[in-house]
Curated annotation (Swiss-Prot):
Gene, per the UniProt record: MDM34
Record GO terms (molecular function): lipid binding
Protein name: Mitochondrial distribution and morphology protein 34
The record's note on its domains: Lacks alpha-helical transmembrane segments, suggesting that it resides in the membrane via beta-sheet conformations similar to those predicted for other outer membrane proteins and porin.
Topology relative to the membrane: Multi-pass membrane protein
Domain SMP-LTD, chain residue ranges per copy: 1-195
HAMAP family in the record: Mdm34
A Gene Ontology biological process term: mitochondrial genome maintenance
């Protein structure tokens, strides 16, 4: 069976090309275009050429006078030409920004400016090959379906042929769009054209739809703002009644523009109260203040000074400052005065914005603050002062505890303890006591022993130990000590017996500590020595008698007038010093007796330094 295709009437019909161009333009602009194309694609030229396609009949399923159904193999290599015009974006940065969300873009200024260039594209040398299913009916028109991708190749000529990468890019993009056109859009275009030709009902229906879709723009326009909303409110959020709306409309139509819908006003208030995010209905976070809100704009409640009663600008409803009607107490007045005098916090209207969250919920009536007691140990010039002071307020008890003690000299008298100002300020933390940098560091027991050894070796007299560390102490008392209760308390226990061959020193009472003046080593003095101390006295070089019957009061007597802390520290130091002296005496006597020679002095022999005493 043979068919003759009359291709010349299609080329001679001018109306056919016009309708085909309109349908192709609509089809090309219907699908999503790449971001580089910034204008509509317009088909300016369409020519099917003089060479018709070749059809090979593979199957005929239905054949009648008014219908036909068959499967063909189509091949086309004609001289058809298609010309398109559009505008492209030559700035790649602008193309990138168009494909990204504006919230995440860096918002450049000059670099984001678009550069639009007109583009003309001509498609020629189109080669098609594929299997086509053709269905014809006078009632339903012509339906053409491609079972495979028919496009084999085509030639794309554009304005940017001199730029290789632009030419290749356009070639690839246009081929992709044409494949979509042949598979999806071309069957629909052919079907609509056939309905216009053979179906009068479809043509009338299409004309009616075009009139409804594109109404005529003739006639005066209508202002939608002149019609009030269903639930109008004024600029202050007050709902307007029908009579008020009528009175407003009688005066002039200008005031109608200031009416707001109540729903829109609530949405704007919710947007103002939101966390400045993209979502309009972000759930609120309780007891959270955003530091970006606490700016100078809140002093005037917005740049325009307008205050909305529904939601104040840049503020939260649960963070408003509530002013109590009750008068301030004396403690509140003092705390307010101290907070006003403190430099560092601005005294503006929004300075307490972030600190007053939940002020209405956590009132002062049911709060229980802990007591803050600061004991002042500083010496005062007045005979009697209040050493203990209580700072801070207590809502549970109104009692004030004041402890009056006597001023006592202590080793901590040189340090300065500043007054604490506890104003319950949540912003400014309490200042730690500042220590005076010129205060002399207190010497430990090891420091005093090392100083004494150095002075003994170099025969240099050391300065006396300060009075707060105790009095000078002798190696061996030359006079009987007065027996009193303090001396009996500080008497050290007898040292433990070490070995049977070591010398056992006699029991020695600890005298008030005195400074040991060093003297040059010399021959033993001819002063009478008691028999009980003859063995121990031979191990030491004689000292000049610097002791008298009248001893100064010991440090224990001074400690009796001090505080309990000072007495305990003095007792501990006295017992430790007495123990160390007894250990030194016993070790020195044992080493001297074991050597069996008295030619060398005490410091000529090897001396192991005592271990460090940590207190």
């Amino acid at each position: 069976m043979a068919f003759n295709f009359n291709w010349s009437p299609l080329m001679a019909d001018a109306g056919f090309y016009t309708r085909a161009q309109d349908l192709l333009t609509a089809a090309l602009n219907k699908s999503p275009k790449p971001p580089i194309i910034v204008d509509d694609i317009v088909v300016t030229e369409l020519n099917l050429g003089s060479n018709p396609p070749e059809l090979e009949i593979l199957e005929i399923g239905d054949l009648a006078e008014d219908r036909f159904r068959g499967i063909f193999k189509m091949s086309y290599a004609g001289d058809a030409v298609l010309t398109l015009k559009t505008c492209v974006q030559a700035n790649p940065l602008n193309t990138y920004l168009l494909t990204r969300h504006p919230f995440t873009s860096p918002q450049p200024l000059a670099a984001a400016t678009g550069l639009t260039i007109p583009l003309q594209i001509t498609l020629s040398d189109i080669k098609l090959s594929g299997f086509v299913i053709l269905v014809f009916s006078k009632q339903k028109g012509i339906t053409v379906v491609f079972r495979n991708d028919p496009l084999e190749s085509l030639k794309v000529s554009s304005t940017f042929d001199s730029i290789p990468f632009v030419r290749d890019y356009l070639q690839k993009e246009i081929e992709g769009q044409l494949r979509i056109l042949f598979m999806d859009e071309l069957p629909a275009i052919i079907h609509r054209l056939s309905l216009r030709l053979w179906s009068t009902e479809y043509s009338e229906l299409e004309t009616t739809c075009d009139q409804v879709t594109n109404p005529s723009l003739e006639g005066p326009g209508q202002d939608p703002l002149l019609n009030p909303p269903q639930d109008p409110v004024d600029s202050f959020g007050n709902v307007l009644s029908t009579s008020e709306i009528a009175s407003l409309s009688l005066d002039s139509g200008v005031e109608m523009h200031s009416l707001f819908s109540r729903k829109n006003a609530l949405r704007i208030a919710a947007l103002t109260d939101s966390q400045r995010t993209l979502s309009l209905f972000t759930p609120s976070i309780r007891e959270v203040v955003f530091r970006a809100w606490t700016g100078s704009i809140e002093q005037a409640d917005g740049p325009s000074g307008l205050v909305s009663p529904m939601s104040p600008p840049l503020s939260r409803t649960q963070s408003h400052i509530t002013v109590a009607s009750a008068p301030l107490s004396s403690q509140d007045t003092a705390s307010v005065a101290s907070s006003q005098s403190r430099p560092g916090l601005p005294s503006s209207g929004y300075s307490g914005y972030g600190l007053s969250l939940g002020a209405a919920r956590h009132s002062k009536a049911h709060a229980c603050k802990r007591k803050k007691r600061v004991i002042d140990l500083r010496p005062h010039r007045k005979p009697t002062d209040d050493i203990a002071s209580i700072s801070g307020e207590s809502s549970c008890t109104d009692s004030t505890i004041t402890t009056t003690t006597k001023s006592a000299a202590s080793v901590y008298s040189s340090s300065i303890i500043p007054e604490e100002n506890n104003d319950d300020d949540p912003v400014t933390p309490p200042v730690s006591p500042v220590r005076n940098s010129t205060v002399r560091r207190r010497q430990t027991l090891r420091d005093r022993i090392v100083d004494r050894d150095d002075a003994e070796r170099t025969n240099i007299r050391r300065p006396p130990i300060p009075a707060e560390f105790g009095h000078e102490f002798p190696l061996r008392p030359t006079q009987p000590l007065p027996s009193n209760e303090i001396d009996r308390n500080v008497t050290s226990p007898n040292p433990k017996p070490e070995d049977s061959h070591h010398f056992q020193p006699p029991r020695q009472d600890t005298a008030p500590i005195r400074n040991i003046p060093s003297a040059p080593l010399g021959p033993p003095a001819q002063a009478p020595i008691p028999a009980s101390a003859s063995a121990s006295a031979s191990a030491y070089p004689p000292e000049k008698p610097t002791y008298t019957q009248s001893f100064p009061p010991s440090f224990m007597e001074v400690a009796q007038n001090g505080s309990i802390l000072e007495q305990a520290w003095m007792m501990k130091m006295a017992s430790e010093i007495a123990r160390r002296i007894q250990d030194e005496n016993s070790s020195a006597m044992g080493s001297y007796v074991g050597s069996g020679s008295g030619s060398g002095g005490f410091w000529d022999r090897s001396h192991t330094p005592p271990p460090a005493y940590r207190h």
